[in-house]
């Protein structure tokens, strides 16, 4: 659609360029912007245009346009608002969704912008009405009715007993007290939501200074607050049953009418099945669904055609006196899920949403046509950051393999070695802010049998139930594991075949060859991951077609071992392959192969050369989260989206689903029935199959089941979270009533969940340091922890409440920035930071690290040091004092003999930096062992250094 700037109203220029709301009021048939201080204040005699701009994860902006029509506005004014929304959409590039909002019948999405409610005022611009500030006039007693259990519709009703009924919630706003009257047939959720309106009235009309009372329908005068409430109505009297309201707008939900707007007229289209192919890109259409009227506008239609189609929709509703029908206008390629769902089938087409890269390219093309230099503008976008795990990885891990309807505990040495034909259960315990947290998961191999999968889910669910539902439960499929899984296991391998009796029986009965991995056989492994704390080796078919230029590989046949590095790999990938080689073939010499210079023997083992891909294997990206409330009438899942959600939307009586595309979270409230709790994983499975957002969800998408009060950080990060709220007692209504009456948030002894700051991972973590804190006894749980050196150092750099999250502890390259290095002439023999470090080893256990005992100077030095931390650093340097009578190396470190520094030493040295064992060798012994000086060694690539250290048992 080509649009001339002369067709656009000047008021819309520059609109939608930043996230947030923008509102215009129609005055004399022109859009006039209103100040942000007046957002949410609507007058019944006016029409408004509301633009909501949302920044998406992909860097683009999404626009939703609403035009709100007051009940007293003129038809001409409402028609102007409808046409101007089309014009505003054109100014934004023609991809916004447009909604018609009628006073009293607004959409949930619209009301979510103005939480907790909107309360339209009488009057408007055309009537010359002047709004009088609340505090400038005598308070008038008013009665409001509230409906809705997710968003609240508020309507003022006559202040009379006849307005009350048993089905709704009523708010009586008097000069000194606000009463909430709860109809006996109203739900807990409706009562809780109405309390948000009470709080709003208290803050807005009473400056937060008035009493609040709750009155239950049916309570007599014996209740003091009930008696006071009924006194305003002349005394208590039973309420009559509300007569059913005759709704003149009844629709046949199963019959949709499709109308084509052609040359100014609406022409009905006859069809047997409502198919996408009926819509032509050069036409506008109306799809009349009764309660909703969609206007679909083809990409090649003109602005005038779109305006005319919009006018036709308004006239259609006006002629039929359909005041409650919602009008939704969509552009081809940007249809809503609700519109697509009306069709029998909707083709899977790539999203036309404009990403930041697309936008940069279009702008560059425009500037280039104008003769400007666009070289800098067209630089490649920065590489995507590795996703964060948002989980503490210093916990303890146990793993079981499913075998014959039972689970077998794996020894620590085998906990990270899975087989694609088997199923596993894992339990991970890790420190939380106020308690130990637990994650229980089941993992299904691609070739595992259904019986083992059912057993795994059943046994894992029993473990969660025995933990009183306080553990998070997850269901994972091979190849679709989330980042949390990988950082928990750190080093993870998947082998071909399986060990379970069920798998062995299945392949025998079906005549399938047993290709279970053999250490001395032929095997090819794809190596992947982001570093030593997140690396995987996946066995693939031993064929050249399994190679990929973006990965490194390990190929072995007996004692013959090759490593292969693709041309698109990084030095970090090469680091990871060396570490995995130490696990898969720890005592074998390997031959390195670079892509393009392979030996004949290498190709021979793979059965000869063949074509192979070069792009990395794609994983589902995390998208903008969507929250849904869930009910299960007669086993059928019914869901409803909650827009612009907050923590307060999670009600303790209900089940909610948070859909992030890459992961599905099922949140279960404390007040939910136990039978429904046990169905939580099934609810998640049904949601994935339903694919409500039509985002082509994979059936293997990870599902997490989370109980209220046990929310992990990787869930709470989607909210502004206050853990005290989820630890309150009572139902949703009782909790909110205590907050409203108390005038603030609940005061509990439990600490609030800290919102952590996540830094990047260290690229190097010494294997021996990690293994030192692991138990290799089958009876014991595998436990990871910080090294003593790091724990002591971290005591000076971290607050008492901080903890390690998602990665092993960050490491420090230098204690001072270059510009702040202490002068050598004035530097003490022991730096303040080091003095604090060594002092922390001697502190009694009753004194916490980071306490008041630290000197102000030490705190300043620590702050200086922490500023030099980076997310990608390679070594931890701790300069401790040279002990008496010990030789000192050139670097100021004590010198120890080689036999005491190796990882298998009978009498190992303690209190050294285990990531740099080689630095404690004397210069002479270092040259003897490594065949080069320390300086020459320091210039080698890191992966090569590590390879040499492994060979000398110093790694």
Swiss-Prot record:
Belongs to the villin/gelsolin family. SUPFAM superfamilies: Actin depolymerizing proteins (SSF55753), C-terminal, gelsolin-like domain of Sec23/24 (SSF82754), VHP, Villin headpiece domain (SSF47050). The keyword Repeat applies. Residues 756-776, 867-878 have a biased composition (Polar residues). GO terms for biological process: actin filament capping; actin filament organization; actin filament severing. SMART domains: GEL, VHP. It comes from the Eukaryota. Its main location: cytoplasm. Gelsolin-like repeats lie at residues 29-111, 152-218, 274-339, 644-712. The gene is VLN5. It is found in: Cytoplasm, Cytoskeleton. Keywords: Actin capping, Actin-binding, Calcium, Cytoplasm, Cytoskeleton, Repeat. Residues 741-783, 801-895 are annotated as: Disordered. Residues 842-864 have a biased composition (Basic and acidic residues). Ca(2+)-regulated actin-binding protein. Binds actin microfilaments (MFs). Involved in actin filament bundling, severing and capping. Caps the barbed end of actin filaments and is able to sever them in a calcium-dependent manner. One of its GO terms (cellular component) is cytoplasm. GO terms for molecular function: actin filament binding. Residues 817-836 have a biased composition (Low complexity). The lineage of its organism: Eukaryota, Viridiplantae, Streptophyta, Embryophyta, Tracheophyta. The keyword Cytoplasm applies. It comes from Oryza sativa subsp. japonica. This is Villin-5. Signal peptide: none annotated. Residues 890-955 form the HP domain. InterPro entries: ADF-H/Gelsolin-like_dom_sf, Gelsolin-like_dom, Gelsolin-like_dom_sf, Villin/Gelsolin, Villin_headpiece, Villin_headpiece_dom_sf.
